[in-house]
A protein has these predicted regions:
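Beta-rich ligand-recognition domains in immune and ubiquitin systems
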Residues: 1-182
Length: 182
Protein backbone atom coordinates (compact mmCIF):
# COMPACT_ATOMS: atom_id res chain seq x y z
CA UNK A 1 0.00 0.00 0.00
CA UNK A 2 0.87 3.67 -0.05
CA UNK A 3 2.29 3.60 3.49
CA UNK A 4 4.92 1.14 2.33
CA UNK A 5 5.90 3.37 -0.58
CA UNK A 6 6.40 6.50 1.52
CA UNK A 7 9.41 4.88 3.20
CA UNK A 8 11.22 5.23 -0.13
CA UNK A 9 10.02 8.73 -0.97
CA UNK A 10 12.68 11.04 -2.38
CA UNK A 11 12.72 14.72 -3.26
CA UNK A 12 13.38 15.64 -6.88
CA UNK A 13 14.10 18.85 -8.79
CA UNK A 14 14.31 19.49 -12.52
CA UNK A 15 17.72 20.33 -13.98
CA UNK A 16 17.33 23.63 -15.88
CA UNK A 17 20.40 22.89 -18.02
CA UNK A 18 18.56 19.96 -19.61
CA UNK A 19 15.23 21.75 -20.19
CA UNK A 20 14.15 22.37 -23.77
CA UNK A 21 13.54 26.05 -24.59
CA UNK A 22 9.76 25.50 -24.74
CA UNK A 23 9.74 24.48 -21.08
CA UNK A 24 9.67 27.02 -18.26
CA UNK A 25 10.72 25.95 -14.76
CA UNK A 26 9.27 27.42 -11.56
CA UNK A 27 8.56 26.53 -7.91
CA UNK A 28 12.30 26.18 -7.22
CA UNK A 29 12.65 23.89 -10.26
CA UNK A 30 9.88 21.57 -9.12
CA UNK A 31 7.46 22.56 -11.90
CA UNK A 32 8.03 22.44 -15.65
CA UNK A 33 5.47 24.00 -17.98
CA UNK A 34 5.32 23.85 -21.76
CA UNK A 35 4.64 27.45 -22.78
CA UNK A 36 2.36 27.84 -25.77
CA UNK A 37 3.97 31.24 -26.41
CA UNK A 38 6.92 29.52 -28.08
CA UNK A 39 10.52 28.79 -27.10
CA UNK A 40 12.60 31.09 -24.93
CA UNK A 41 16.21 31.81 -25.85
CA UNK A 42 18.27 29.52 -23.63
CA UNK A 43 22.04 29.23 -23.26
CA UNK A 44 23.40 26.23 -25.14
CA UNK A 45 24.39 23.33 -22.91
CA UNK A 46 25.71 19.96 -23.92
CA UNK A 47 23.04 18.33 -21.74
CA UNK A 48 20.11 20.37 -23.09
CA UNK A 49 17.40 18.77 -25.25
CA UNK A 50 17.58 21.04 -28.29
CA UNK A 51 14.52 19.85 -30.24
CA UNK A 52 12.68 17.56 -27.81
CA UNK A 53 10.18 18.94 -25.26
CA UNK A 54 11.97 17.22 -22.42
CA UNK A 55 13.67 17.81 -19.07
CA UNK A 56 15.57 15.55 -16.66
CA UNK A 57 15.90 15.72 -12.90
CA UNK A 58 19.17 16.58 -11.15
CA UNK A 59 18.88 13.49 -8.98
CA UNK A 60 19.85 10.08 -10.27
CA UNK A 61 19.87 6.56 -8.90
CA UNK A 62 22.39 3.73 -9.12
CA UNK A 63 21.04 1.53 -6.33
CA UNK A 64 18.26 1.16 -3.80
CA UNK A 65 14.51 1.82 -3.83
CA UNK A 66 13.14 5.26 -4.62
CA UNK A 67 9.57 6.54 -4.83
CA UNK A 68 8.37 9.87 -6.21
CA UNK A 69 5.12 11.43 -7.33
CA UNK A 70 4.35 13.97 -9.99
CA UNK A 71 1.25 15.91 -10.92
CA UNK A 72 0.40 16.14 -14.61
CA UNK A 73 -1.98 19.03 -15.34
CA UNK A 74 -3.61 17.43 -18.38
CA UNK A 75 -3.00 14.59 -20.82
CA UNK A 76 -0.05 14.78 -23.23
CA UNK A 77 3.07 13.72 -21.43
CA UNK A 78 5.57 10.90 -21.13
CA UNK A 79 7.05 10.28 -17.68
CA UNK A 80 9.87 7.87 -17.02
CA UNK A 81 13.54 7.31 -16.39
CA UNK A 82 16.59 7.39 -18.64
CA UNK A 83 20.29 6.70 -18.69
CA UNK A 84 22.46 9.80 -18.97
CA UNK A 85 23.51 8.76 -22.48
CA UNK A 86 20.07 9.45 -24.05
CA UNK A 87 20.52 11.49 -27.27
CA UNK A 88 19.75 15.20 -26.79
CA UNK A 89 20.62 17.02 -29.99
CA UNK A 90 18.75 15.12 -32.70
CA UNK A 91 15.42 15.97 -34.26
CA UNK A 92 12.67 13.38 -34.34
CA UNK A 93 11.46 10.94 -31.73
CA UNK A 94 14.73 9.20 -30.88
CA UNK A 95 15.50 11.59 -28.01
CA UNK A 96 12.12 11.05 -26.32
CA UNK A 97 11.97 9.08 -23.10
CA UNK A 98 10.86 5.54 -23.97
CA UNK A 99 11.73 5.86 -27.67
CA UNK A 100 15.21 4.35 -27.36
CA UNK A 101 16.82 1.44 -25.53
CA UNK A 102 18.22 3.84 -22.91
CA UNK A 103 14.89 4.86 -21.38
CA UNK A 104 11.46 3.74 -20.16
CA UNK A 105 8.24 5.77 -20.05
CA UNK A 106 4.51 5.86 -19.44
CA UNK A 107 2.49 7.86 -21.98
CA UNK A 108 -0.47 9.84 -20.67
CA UNK A 109 -2.85 11.06 -23.35
CA UNK A 110 -6.52 11.46 -24.20
CA UNK A 111 -6.99 8.06 -25.77
CA UNK A 112 -4.78 5.28 -24.52
CA UNK A 113 -2.41 4.71 -21.62
CA UNK A 114 0.80 3.20 -23.02
CA UNK A 115 4.17 1.99 -21.79
CA UNK A 116 7.23 2.60 -23.99
CA UNK A 117 10.75 1.18 -24.15
CA UNK A 118 13.08 1.03 -27.17
CA UNK A 119 10.37 2.69 -29.26
CA UNK A 120 8.06 -0.28 -28.64
CA UNK A 121 4.62 0.47 -27.30
CA UNK A 122 2.49 -1.59 -24.96
CA UNK A 123 -1.14 -0.49 -24.69
CA UNK A 124 -2.47 -0.60 -21.12
CA UNK A 125 -6.02 -1.00 -19.84
CA UNK A 126 -7.83 1.64 -17.81
CA UNK A 127 -8.13 5.44 -17.96
CA UNK A 128 -5.63 7.09 -20.30
CA UNK A 129 -4.80 9.95 -17.94
CA UNK A 130 -4.04 10.15 -14.24
CA UNK A 131 -3.40 13.57 -12.75
CA UNK A 132 -1.05 12.18 -10.11
CA UNK A 133 1.48 9.51 -10.96
CA UNK A 134 3.65 7.65 -8.47
CA UNK A 135 6.82 5.90 -9.60
CA UNK A 136 8.73 3.30 -7.62
CA UNK A 137 12.20 2.35 -8.83
CA UNK A 138 13.80 -0.74 -7.31
CA UNK A 139 17.23 -0.66 -8.92
CA UNK A 140 18.54 -4.05 -7.81
CA UNK A 141 15.27 -5.85 -8.57
CA UNK A 142 15.23 -4.16 -11.98
CA UNK A 143 11.68 -2.86 -11.68
CA UNK A 144 10.05 0.49 -12.39
CA UNK A 145 6.42 0.47 -11.20
CA UNK A 146 3.82 3.16 -11.96
CA UNK A 147 0.87 4.01 -9.72
CA UNK A 148 -2.13 6.15 -10.70
CA UNK A 149 -4.39 8.33 -8.56
CA UNK A 150 -5.35 6.44 -5.45
CA UNK A 151 -2.37 4.11 -5.81
CA UNK A 152 -3.76 1.90 -8.57
CA UNK A 153 -0.87 -0.08 -10.04
CA UNK A 154 -0.72 0.87 -13.71
CA UNK A 155 2.34 -0.92 -15.07
CA UNK A 156 5.75 -2.32 -14.19
CA UNK A 157 8.86 -2.51 -16.36
CA UNK A 158 11.32 -5.34 -15.68
CA UNK A 159 14.89 -4.80 -16.77
CA UNK A 160 18.44 -5.36 -15.58
CA UNK A 161 19.53 -1.75 -15.13
CA UNK A 162 23.22 -1.12 -15.82
CA UNK A 163 23.70 2.64 -15.50
CA UNK A 164 22.57 5.57 -13.39
CA UNK A 165 18.90 6.42 -13.96
CA UNK A 166 17.53 9.96 -14.17
CA UNK A 167 13.80 10.74 -13.89
CA UNK A 168 12.67 12.32 -17.18
CA UNK A 169 9.55 14.11 -18.45
CA UNK A 170 8.45 14.87 -22.01
CA UNK A 171 5.81 17.59 -21.82
CA UNK A 172 3.25 18.41 -24.51
CA UNK A 173 1.98 21.91 -25.33
CA UNK A 174 0.14 23.67 -22.53
CA UNK A 175 0.91 20.91 -20.03
CA UNK A 176 2.70 21.38 -16.71
CA UNK A 177 4.29 18.73 -14.52
CA UNK A 178 4.98 19.32 -10.83
CA UNK A 179 7.28 17.15 -8.73
CA UNK A 180 5.43 16.58 -5.45
CA UNK A 181 7.57 17.34 -2.42
CA UNK A 182 5.36 15.32 -0.08
Amino acid sequence: GKEGLSAYRCSLTFDPRTANGHLSLSLENRRAEHLISGPRPVPPYEVRFDHTWQVLCFQSFRSGRHYWELEVSKPWAYVGVTYETIPRKEKGKRCMVGMNDLSWSLQLDEHQLCAWHSGRREALAGPSHHSRIGMLLDYEAGTLTYYGDGQTRLHAFHCAFTEELFPACWIGEGVSITLCST
